[in-house]
Amino acid sequence: MTTLNPEPRTLNPAFPLRNRLWYFGFFCLVIVAGLASRRFGPILPKVIAAYAGDTLWALMVFLGFGMLWPKRSTLWLAVMAAGFSYLIEFSQIYHAPWIDAIRQNRLGGLVLGRGFLWSDLVCYSIGILIGFGLETIWSKMRANHHNSP
C-alpha cells in the first residue's frame, strides 16, 4: 500500500548532497579571494599576505573535489584534497627544465608552485580543515532542518 505522505527524506551528514552550482560559486569566490590576497598583499597584515593564498588554494581544491565527487563523504574529500595538495607541494622538490618552464608561467606557478615550503603544508591543512569544518556544520544544520517537524 502506498501512502500519499511518505516519510521525509533524511540526509546523512557523512554523505551530504552537494549542489555543484553552489560549489562552483564558492570555488570561484575562493579563487578571487586568493588572487586578491596576492594583489593586495602589501596592504594586508603580513600573516594574511604570507599565508592566505596557500590556505585558500587548498580550500579551492577541497571545493573542486566536492564538485567532482558530490556523493563522497566529507572525510573522503578532505583526505583526497590533502593528498593532492601535499603531492603538488612535494613535487616542488623536483626541478627539471621542462617543469620549471611550466612553473615560470603565471598559471603554472599558481597551480604547481615554485618551491617546497613546510609552511605551505600547514596552510594546506588549515584550508582543508576550514572546508571540512564548514561542510560538516552545514550538513548537520541541513540534516536538522530536514528532520524537524
Spans of model-derived segments:
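Short, highly charged, low-complexity non-transmembrane loops/tails of multi-pass membrane proteins
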Residues: 142-149
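Bulky hydrophobic segments
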Residues: 2-142
